[in-house]
From Swiss-Prot:
Transmembrane segments: none annotated. Gene3D superfamilies: 3.30.300.10. This is S-adenosylmethionine synthase. One of its GO terms (biological process) is S-adenosylmethionine biosynthetic process. Coiled coil: none annotated. Belongs to the AdoMet synthase family.
Length: 391
């Protein structure tokens, strides 16, 4: 049976991604000085303006306007002709402390209040909710091919802009990849869509030629392309006005880009700007870690795990697994292995993945999962041998 599946990615200059990177830059700066700082930082951008808001409780000081300007400069919006300038944009901040009602549940979990705890029970989940983790062996990154390929194309767009290969490119851009599957395995790429912001001096014919030569051919293996592969490069014909001048941006608006490109389910919680006591982030990272190690251990070809939490309670209220018919054992047996090998209380996740560190801005663009260009703890295959002992 053949079917098509499509996923998209965006570059670091996309308005929503600018916001994610600013929020995580603030988080990293605080964790660097105060590893126990509590951060829920939201950012909005529009023409000529950045607003940073949220709830932050910390003993340290960080210069938020300076962080904002440095982040925007690093992305590439450093002159007015790009429609957004790190030096001249206004930066508005509105920061409160974390609610004492929320802090009360995170600081002392329900298990602690009832006297039925060990030390790791003392950290309660920062909110209720469910988080999903996913892995598949269809790529070496244990990621679905559509999102993995879309991320690589987006990253390459920024590379050729920054290294001067295509100097007329500007920071905003999007990619989209449609993969054809046969009996559950990727066999070819059916369509590639790339929209990239550019200077007014260049024509579409040049952009199409350059993107195919310096982006697509460099990233996509030739055996996945054929005479029927369709290419849509700047299909509107012109993309000069972009970034915050073209569209307003908000933190947390690219949650499918951040995860599995729609191939796996999503619990709805965004990542950027949240410290690791927020299970929206830490438990989603842990779920990816669990799923990837299970697939690498041969438990299934494709696996999704759901974790659910109650605010102020340390232990997950539920753990659920789906192997989509590819499991080498029952889903119930896999959940039993998860409970034996992994401790999924927030305090244990923070400890085992060493999450109270400034490691978040680097994943705020080009995906939080499947990253081989950086070392992030939730991508490590460090539980495979232990899992195999229980198979």
């Amino acid at each position: 049976m053949r079917k098509l599946f499509t996923s998209e990615s965006v570059t670091e200059g996309h308005p929503d991604k600018i916001c994610d990177q600013i929020s995580d830059a603030v988080l990293d700066a605080i964790l660097d000085k105060d590893p126990n700082g509590r951060v829920a930082c939201e950012t909005a951008v529009t023409t000529g303006m950045v607003m940073v808001m949220g709830e932050i409780s910390t003993k340290c000081y960080v210069d938020i306007p300076k962080l904002v300007r440095e982040t925007i400069r690093g992305i590439g919006y450093d002159r007015a002709k790009y429609g957004f300038d790190c030096e001249t944009c206004s930066v508005i901040t509105s920061i409160d402390e974390q609610s004492v009602d929320i802090a009360m549940g995170v600081d002392e979990a329900l298990e602690s209040k009832k006297g039925e705890m060990d030390r790791l029970d003392a950290v309660g989940a920062g909110d209720q909710g469910m988080m999903f983790g996913f892995a598949t062996n269809e790529t070496k990154e244990y990621m679905p091919m559509p999102i993995e390929m879309a991320h690589k194309l987006s990253r390459r767009l920024s590379e050729v802009r920054k290294n001067g290969t295509l100097p007329y490119l500007r920071p905003d851009g999007k990619t989209q990849v449609t993969v054809e599957y046969e009996n559950g395995k990727p066999v070819r790429i059916d369509a590639i869509v790339i929209s990239t912001q550019h200077g007014p001096e260049v024509y579409l014919e040049q952009i199409e030629k350059d993107i195919k030569e310096h982006v697509i051919k460099v990233i996509v293996p030739s055996e996945l392309l054929d005479e029927n592969t369709k290419y849509f490069i700047n299909p509107t014909g012109r993309f000069v006005v972009g970034g915050p001048q073209g569209d307003s941006g908000l933190t947390g608006r690219k949650i499918i880009v951040d995860t599995y490109g729609g191939y796996g389910r999503h619990g709805g919680g965004a990542f950027s700007g949240k410290d690791p006591t927020k299970v929206d982030r830490s438990a989603a990272y842990a779920a990816r870690w669990v799923a990837k190690n299970l697939v690498a251990a041969g438990v299934a070809d494709k696996l999704e795990i759901q974790l659910a939490y109650a605010i102020g309670v340390a232990k997950p209220v539920s753990i659920s697994v789906d192997t989509f018919g590819t499991g080498k054992m029952t889903d119930e047996e896999i959940v039993s292995i998860v409970n034996k090998v992994f401790d999924l209380r927030p305090g244990a996740i923070i400890r085992d993945l060493d999450l109270r560190r400034p490691i978040y801005k680097q994943v705020a663009a080009y995906g939080h999962f499947g990253r081989t260009d950086i070392d992030v703890p939730w991508e490590r295959l460090d539980k495979v041998e232990e899992i195999k002992k229980h198979i």
